[in-house]
Amino acid sequence: NVRAFVKDDGADEILAGYETYQAYFIHQAYRRLPSWFRHHLLQPLVDRLPASDAKVSWDFKLKRFVAAGDLSSEDAHGTWRMIFSANARARLLDPIKNSPQASADVLNLYRATFAQTNARHALNRMLYVDTRFYLPNDMLVKVDRMSMAHGLEVRVPFLDHRLVELAARVPPNLKLKHFRHKKYLLKAAMQGRLPNKILWRRKQGFNI
């Protein structure tokens, strides 16, 4: 008899819940390392790490991080959001090469979205981009299609425009505390309301 349910989409994008936000600032330091050190020592070591079948494993994260070592930090953020590399995408879409999907340059779409924001802090710039681009084109579309296929209505309270506007005014250090604690403000607000084993557990994700 259920006709509507609540989904938590949007919290990661407005309150900094992804590891890529931490990776962005690490990447800025990584790019300052000597090129020979990155290309001839670190990258070969990371490339030799054995592949793991674990969900979003450490070797996968490191390889994606290092592969973006020569990009700007904003471009790196865009590539970390992609599932397929440009070459893999071209091979997969070759049979339909004349389609808009095959010709789309996803990285340029990210750059265009970054150019739309006048936020000064890097974290707020990323949150804007992910809210405007990643959230509607990846997260929300999956939920919308699955729910509509079963005649269900999904409500997303974290995307209430008043909450989104409030989150945009919150200082970045209350979203990503000491560049370590993701969604810090939300977790602090829920302290004592949710068990710690739920509140502070590692992010599970919903990968498809």
Residue spans of the language-model regions?
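PAPS-dependent sulfotransferase catalytic core
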Residues: 194-208
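Short, conserved phosphate/pyrophosphate- and ester-handling motifs at nucleotide-, phospho-/glycolipid
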Residues: 160
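Glycine-rich active-site loop/lid subdomains used to bind and stabilize high-energy intermediates
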Residues: 1-151, 197
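Active-site rim elements
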Residues: 122, 151-154, 173-177
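Short, solvent-exposed hinge/capping segments at secondary-structure junctions
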Residues: 164-168
